[in-house]
Amino acid sequence: MAKNKQSVFEEKNYTQTEPENIFGDLYDGKSTVEEDPNIKVAYDADGNGYYIAFNKETGVYYDPYGDTEYDISQLFDENGNPFVFDEKQEENDYLKYVGNPDYGSYDENGEWVWSGYFENDQWISTKESQPTDENYGFDSDLPPEVKQPESVEDNYGFDNDLPPEVKQPESVEDNYGFDNDLPPEVKQPESVVDQPSSDDYFAKQPTDENYGFDNDLPPEVKQPESVVDQPSSDDHFAKQPESTTDSYSFDSDLPQPTLDQPSLDDHVQYNFDHHEELKPVAEEQNNYQVGFDQVQANLDNNEEIQPTAEKKVTTDFESKQAQVVDSYQLPIDTDQQDQTTFSSSFETQPTVEQFDQVNSEVNDQFKPEITKEPVLESSFNKQDVVETSDLNSESNLYSENNKDATNNDSLNSEFIQLNSNSETASDDVHYESKSEPIHDYKFGSDLSQSNSNNSLESEPVKFNSETAPDAHFESQSEPVDQVQYDIYQNEELKPTLDQPSSDDYFAKQPTDENYGFDNDLPPEVKQPESVVDQPSSDDHFAKQPESTTDSYSFDSDLPQPTLDQPSLDDHVQYNFDHHEELKPVAEEQNNYQVGFDQVQANLDNNEEIQPTAEKEVTTDFESKQAQVVDSYQLPIDTDQQDQTTFSSSFETQPTVEQFDQVNSEVNDQFKPEITKEPVLESSFNKQDVVETSNYTNNLQKFDIQSDNKITITTKKSSPQIPTTLPISFVSNRIEYKPVETLALDNKESQQEQITINSITEDSKTLAKTLSVQLQQINSLNNQSIVTSESVRLDKKDDQLTINTVNSEDQQPKIEVFVKAKEPVEEHSITQNKQSVEDKSELDNFNKKSDLYKIISELKRGELNPTINFDAIFQMNDYQMSVKQSFIHLNDFVTNYKNQISERYLIIKKELQSELSRLIDQNENLNVQFNNAKNLTTLQKEEMIRSLASDFAIAYKPSNSYEQLQKSGEIMRHVQRAITENEKKIESIQGSLKQLKTVYNSCCETIMNNINKLDNTLRFAKKEKDPLLLSNFDSVTDNGLVEPNQLMDDLIDFSNTFDNISNEQLDDFIYENMDRNIDFEFEGFNNDFVDIDAKVMDSMSAFSVNDLDIETLVPDRTSNFSSLLDEDLFESSGDFSLDY
């Protein structure tokens, strides 16, 4: 029985069949298939999946089931993101937290339930804050490796600068940082009962506003810098049951105040006076941004805690020098006996000084009584959040942008110490300050100080570390291991109120001006930029109630003036005098570059401050005889017992001069000459920008005076014998007349004075003469000192005087004095202002002077062994220059040969590819043309049959005619395309032929140049000994051979080899091998010498003078290991296309 065709060839679409239907279900689901964490799945742009594994040793991504390597930059993950191969973390990373009540709890079924989740190894708790124990709210039980997330909105931006490992978790919104949920046993009473006396109040408990901070905990409970665990505020409350004052404790989720950021003082202001108790300050505050409105409302409605002050403090807290300055002091080493003192005097003294953690003992002689608390007045502006402060007795140091500044990393920058080596001072400097908010600081904060005395306005400024401008700031310090400055007490600046200012008082505790800085901290207790755990200022106040000194806390980013670097000298002037005390100096300064125009305007209007400098120096610094010079001094050895006076004063704004690791020395009348360390002293002329310098070191000293007279002095400790060296000038050529009495004895004193009266010589001749004289003096003293300074003297009656005096260590000192009748800058020794032409002429003159020295020795009949190939003619330099030039030329030629070959091959390849494409396209067009032609023939026949059938219904003549027209259009279009392609093919073929011709011409030119280089190098190898040996007798017998004659002989010698082939040159070299001629050439290999002569058959003969490659720029970066790559030239031959 025959089978049906359809049953045999059954049409089935196997492509749509599931794989399970073909191979069966390979996975039955009974056994667990373990996923390999080392294998990932990635997808390409088309959605194709790939298995990816990573080889850690080779750094290659590959197919774990094959040998294929992948580029993961072209792959994506399942979400369409760029693929990243992250190895799976260990599964039991978080199992170690199971059972920890901080991460969850067990339910009634005994199953562990997490109270949050981990995100990037950071624990994020979703559990609402509940009062569990005394340490509620603190993460003291968290292990150190668990990192806390940043707060979102409840931290009020205070912990933005904390490191990630100590970030506080999110706090609950309805807690607002207060102790509403504290346990009953540590709850504080809401109303104020009778407050104890001020002494007991300060001694037993901290202030209520900052209550809850552990700033001044004892050292044994001090928390480390980056440890998460810290004592809770509840423990702090429990430890002080004696206090009945209404205390406000912030929630544990709020960040603790660090060294650099104002914490809660932006919202609650302290005001401690001498004779009144501390009371909370009520503030007008509406709709505060951090949710303090409810608390403030409670404060306003509480009649029992109304402030007794007569004035109010504003909520903007621009003043950081209110009664309690928002500054925190780190522990200071007990070995530090002296600390830098900054004290201020005001009409009232409304502050309590914060003491050091370790050295916290207060001198019993100075325990002022708390007398009166000034009135605090607060006002809050909702619209522009610009707050004002009225404190006649306080100095403002906060800005209206301080809230933003707390989030800035600049507030956590390292402190710049007042002195780099923990300098201290023995006397205090009194400030009488008044200031206004300044809004143009670069770091976005208003730094101001206010005082009713209107005596001084001084602001610490943040400067750039490289170009730190000077500031008018008067400080006095006694640096360790440096020159000590004795400053006597000033009788003019008197404090407005009595204030303890004893040396012992300030020696044992930190002063308020410098409070908050870690200048004197030992290295082991230095805090990093971002410190979490800071002791509470409240505990600090509790331990030290005796102090009433007004405290200043400068911003952490503000550098302090140091003695080593130009720091604040443009705004604060140093005046360390022996018999005068420092006084603030006012300065005229407009439009200063760091935004101090407003401050300087206030200083200009201040009439009470007068500069203490006796003389005023203009900004051009033309006169070095003035008392004050804008200069800086390097550290001086401790052995230097003399005292140095630093003083400066300016009529107009001085131009700030940038120093690059260079310090300048003060021209001081009271300071003896220091010769142990080289010091550079520079001054900048603002008008004509001519820089004059004084150099002082162990060898040379250049000083500028008022006359056009140059005096060079070298000293020796032995007796002095004057010696005069006459010099004559003949045809711009200097000849020395030998002096017979030139015997120099080191045991005897010698002072040589050479006076040169320049009558008819120009400035260049005198400059050359100066160098000659210095060299002559050095040669006479067997020294090797060479000066390269150029002295320009334009007057004919200028006088040059050279005094040489050698020191005990046989090192001569050269002092050059230019005494000019004209202004100094016209005849001064300028630094880095000489032209290249003057330098080259001076070098040539020095070379000639060496030649004349040899001539003088030869004339004296001395046998000079230095008369040789190199000493007279300096042929070694010539040979080395020739070698280097040839190396560079060869290097360039080789690179250029490779470059043109590469360009040619690229163009040739592209044109050949285009030719192949056009040929293939024409073949396809020919096929289309033939098909269209056949179709047209069929359509014509069909139309003829239609016409022959009398237009039967089955035929449609109209459609046949339209199809015939379309076929004709297709034929014409294809024919035009074929014609255009043929034209392109013909043009490309012509271009290829022309390209080949031009390339061959370029290769011939390059080979010709290589041939010239090879032959020239051969000449350079052979010309050394044969030529010079033949002329050496004439050199020694007849004297000097003119350089022009030497060059002519060299050229004549080389011309004899112009037409010699390479084989003949090799034979010549072989014949002269017995003469020990060195034919080896450094930097070249044998490939360069062994050039195939067949390649150079088409090249014409040449001479040394016809090198036409001097315009080529050498390329020193290429490798010329294979100079001639003949295979590269051969590989770029003709081509053929079959079409």
Swiss-Prot record:
It is found in: Cell projection, Attachment organelle membrane. One of its GO terms (biological process) is adhesion of symbiont to microvasculature. InterPro entries: Cytadherence_HMW-1_N (IPR021199), EAGR_box (IPR022466), EAGR_sf (IPR038145). Gene3D superfamilies: 3.30.70.3600. Residues 241-250, 404-424, 545-554 have a biased composition (Polar residues). One of its GO terms (cellular component) is cell projection. Residues 902-935, 974-1025 form a coiled coil. Residues 128-266, 369-570 are annotated as: Disordered. Keywords: Cell membrane, Cell projection, Coiled coil, Cytadherence, Membrane, Virulence. Residues 389-400, 445-458 have a biased composition (Low complexity). Residues 427-443 have a biased composition (Basic and acidic residues). Component of the cytoskeleton-like structure which stabilizes the shape of the wall-less Mycoplasma. This cytoskeleton-like network of accessory proteins containing HMW proteins 1 to 5 allows the proper anchoring of cytadhesin proteins in the mycoplasmal membrane at the attachment organelle. This is Cytadherence high molecular weight protein 1.
